[in-house]
């Protein structure tokens, strides 16, 4: 029987909660090898430390970290580590955490742990500090109270950004960017631009973890990624070039995809003597064939 491979077109969050069709490499151990073109220093994902540039995407994608809140498939905010929030006034937010949340090292993820993580975040991550505008954080058991320096109606949305993964600050961050989170996997080895090794979190608070070990291989070249999947060197691929898709449109492979909120856009120079004219900008916009962009440049995957 041929092993069916998984081709990840969109964010591969399915990894974190277990892939039931993952092939077992040993009778008593389920392992999974994942090829990714985006997990690299050039893409500002040099490690899995969410407080380092855009590495929060890798932290959350590979199941190491989780945020207080997250976006649903319909882009609605829903609880994750937190169970509810209250906007007390325009500067004050009270967040209540779920009971029983623990880090992978066994430490309880309570209000104090969240306070420490968020304080470290705004100290080390310029974009997060600018988004959140936190003035103070207080912790009382499983309740965290955040006061902002200015009204932040989108605070909960910002806390859902991957940079908001809650990590155990007391456990520290290794020299190669490994952190302790609350997710279903624990990172045991990381070499930037080469690989990440993950094992199941035996202390996971939110259900069973179905895969024992995951290896994420950084394969920055799309053609090389396609060859690796064809050769059976990896079980799934993320970030493959659209031109390679026809190679996998058969019964041996499955495409997994989801809609994204990501938007691609171009700026127009309002100070230019040409594009400062609204009529010119409108004409340029009308002349852009969006349908052809999707059907030709993206081969319909857009």
Predicted regions: what is each one?
Residues 54, 76, 159-209, 213, ...:
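Gly/Pro-rich hinge or "lid" segments in bacterial periplasmic/extracellular proteins
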Residues 19-29:
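Sec-dependent signal peptide cleavage junction
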Residues 35-88, 180:
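N-terminal lobe/hinge region of extracytoplasmic solute-binding protein
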Residues 83-125, 274-276:
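Aromatic- and charge-enriched surface segment that lines or borders ligand/interaction sites
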Residues 29-40, 92-95, 114-117, 144-146, ...:
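Short, well-ordered beta-strand elements
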Residues 202-247:
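Ligand-site clamp/hinge motif
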Residues 86, 90, 94, 128-170:
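Surface-exposed binding/hinge segments that line
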Residues 271, 275-302:
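Periplasmic-binding protein-like
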């Amino acid at each position: 029987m041929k092993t069916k491979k998984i081709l990840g077109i969109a964010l591969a969050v399915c990894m974190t909660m277990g892939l039931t069709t993952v092939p077992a490499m040993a009778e008593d151990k389920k392992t999974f090898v994942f090829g990714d073109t985006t997990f690299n220093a050039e893409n500002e994902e040099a490690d899995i430390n969410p407080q380092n540039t855009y590495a929060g995407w890798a932290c959350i994608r590979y199941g190491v970290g989780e945020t207080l809140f997250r976006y649903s498939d319909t882009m609605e905010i829903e609880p994750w580590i937190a169970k509810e929030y209250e906007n007390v006034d325009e500067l004050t937010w009270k967040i209540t955490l779920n009971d029983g949340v623990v880090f992978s090292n066994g430490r309880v993820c309570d209000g104090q742990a969240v306070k420490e993580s968020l304080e470290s975040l705004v100290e080390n991550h310029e974009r997060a500090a600018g988004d959140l505008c936190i003035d103070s954080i207080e912790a009382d058991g499983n309740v965290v109270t955040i006061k902002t320096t200015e009204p932040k109606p989108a605070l909960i949305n910002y806390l859902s950004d991957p940079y908001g993964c809650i990590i155990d600050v007391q456990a520290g961050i290794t020299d190669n960017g490994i952190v302790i989170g609350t997710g279903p996997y624990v990172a045991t080895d990381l070499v930037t631009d080469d690989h990440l090794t993950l094992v199941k979190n035996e202390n996971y608070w939110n259900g069973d973890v179905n895969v024992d070990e995951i290896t994420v291989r950084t394969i920055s070249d799309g053609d090389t990624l396609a060859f690796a999947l064809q050769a059976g060197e990896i079980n799934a691929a993320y970030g493959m070039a659209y031109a390679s898709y026809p190679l996998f449109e058969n019964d041996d492979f499955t495409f997994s995809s989801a809609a994204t909120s990501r938007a691609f856009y171009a700026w127009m120079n309002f100070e230019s003597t040409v594009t400062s004219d609204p009529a010119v900008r409108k004409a340029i916009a009308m002349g852009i064939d969006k349908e052809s962009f999707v059907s030709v440049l993206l081969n319909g995957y857009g």
